[in-house]
A protein has these predicted regions:
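NTP-dependent nucleotidyl-transfer catalytic core
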Residues: 1-176
């Protein structure tokens, strides 16, 4: 709703707006749902994508002009290139589990806008049960190593088969 209101406001002020909205089509939840339903990932997420568009139309919310999907080959390639660049700068690292993580310790001001103190972070249930190995509690996955629970949802990369993490998806699509 916010994006719709902002777009309408800017257009009323004479600005030309080109809006892009990522519809997450690969993450832990979609893979799990796909597996549990016995459907291919693309078929599973298509149902939710269609319902989302119907909701937009029902509420008369303006659609974005572009809806990129993280699973498009050009974005997967972009994500891999971005992770390689971060890795070469020491900002990303591959852990023992073969996943690649973003090293938050390289950014002392991370969380400043949200008034977060990284030293005071404690694991939540989700983080405590995280299946991935990382240097610090705040580090997040850029590339998740393939796991048999992922089924056929994986791409080849310099770190082995795996899939993108949520954060890098948006970064790659926003800068493509």
């Amino acid at each position: 709703l916010f994006e719709d209101l902002l777009q309408r406001h800017l257009e009323a002020r004479g600005y030309q707006v080109e809006r892009v909205m990522n519809l997450t089509d690969v993450d832990d939840k979609t893979i799990r749902g796909s597996r549990e339903s016995g459907r291919r990932l693309a078929d599973f997420t298509a149902v939710y994508k269609d319902a989302f568009f119907q909701d937009l139309d029902t509420l008369r919310i303006k659609r974005a002009q572009h809806f990129p999907a993280a699973t498009e080959p050009r974005y997967i390639e972009r994500m891999i290139a971005m992770i390689q660049q971060l890795e070469s700068q020491g900002i990303a690292y591959q852990a023992e589990d073969k996943s690649v993580y973003f090293r938050l310790s390289k950014f002392p001001d991370y969380g400043k806008l949200a008034h977060l103190n990284l030293e005071e972070l404690r694991p939540t249930g989700r983080i405590a049960n995280d299946e991935y190995e990382k240097e610090s509690i705040g580090d997040f996955a850029l590339w998740k190593a393939w796991d048999e629970k992922d089924g056929d949802v994986a791409w080849d990369s310099p770190w082995g088969r795996g899939r993108p993490g949520w954060h890098i998806e948006c970064s790659a699509m926003a800068t493509a």
